[in-house]
Design a protein with these regions (language model features):
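Conserved C-terminal guanine-recognition region of P-loop GTPase G domains, centered on the G4
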Residues: 120-136, 142
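Structural beta-sheet core signal
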Residues: 37, 89, 111, 139-141
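NTP-binding/hydrolysis catalytic cores, primarily Walker-type P-loop NTPases
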Residues: 186-212
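Hydrophobic positions on the alpha1 helix immediately C-terminal to the Walker A/P-loop
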Residues: 20
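Inter-motif core of Ras-like GTPase G domains
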Residues: 96-117
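Beta-strand-loop-alpha "switch" segments that mediate conformational coupling across diverse proteins
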Residues: 145, 155-185
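P-loop/Walker-type NTP enzyme "switch/lid" segment
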Residues: 2-15, 23-100, 128, 179-188
Length: 212
């Protein structure tokens, strides 16, 4: 069965796409899924994280990464799709051609949003591409405080715009950055911590959405 493809996209830089891709990939790989990562962001942060991980852990049966752009993108995506259960695409913030290809290939699009007006406003172009391509999309509140008026306002504004939010949100936790610095996931560095618990719930929720 071809892989289900999760494209992580957001027009605004610094929304946490790369961290999200890496952390979800580790969580799913540890659960026995064959996970492929496709890094199409010219910045190459996901590839740098993976190189650090590979240097420390060596080859892993359930986790691979390919970096591609331009004409190679479709070919590499087909290869990953054929050999994995799940493929995660880390997309660039502003390269419209690559983003469109990643969106069209997706089973589901995940749009991370930090609780700020700028992130909220930046979601519109990505969601519009998803609507035009008729690909389901979910928004995720990322680096969010546990509660507060701003978070409530952003939730309300997203709902009023017809945007579907994931039930799970991710807190603003240093554990994510610490794990990335080690080339690992929070499910490995702090498996009983709050960050790992949030990631596990999010991974379960997304996998259910990807199944349809």
């Amino acid at each position: 069965m071809p892989a289900r493809i999760l494209t992580i996209a957001q027009q605004k830089g610094g929304a946490g796409k790369t961290t999200l891709a890496a952390q979800l990939a580790v969580t799913w790989a540890k659960a026995g899924r064959r996970v492929g990562l496709l890094d199409i962001d010219p910045q190459g942060s996901l590839s740098a994280w993976f190189a650090l991980r590979h240097a420390r852990l060596g080859d892993e049966a359930n986790l691979t990464l390919v970096q591609a752009a331009g004409w190679r993108l479709g070919t590499e995506l087909d290869r990953l799709r054929a050999g994995h259960d799940l493929v995660l695409i880390d997309s660039p913030p502003h390269a419209e051609t690559e983003v469109r290809i990643a969106v069209r290939a997706a089973t589901l699009i995940l749009v991370p949003i930090q609780p700020s007006p700028m992130d909220l406003w930046a979601t519109a172009p990505t969601l519009e591409i998803a609507r035009r391509e008729k690909i389901p999309a979910l928004a995720l509140l990322n680096r969010a405080p546990a509660k507060g008026k701003l978070v409530d306002r952003i939730r309300a504004d997203l709902a009023a715009s017809g945007v579907t939010l994931t039930t799970t949100s991710l807190g603003n936790r240093i554990a994510f950055a610490s794990a990335m610095l080690d080339g690992r996931g929070v499910s490995e560095t702090q498996p009983r911590g709050s960050a790992a618990s949030e990631l596990t719930r999010l991974a379960t929720e997304l996998e259910q959405s990807l199944a349809y």
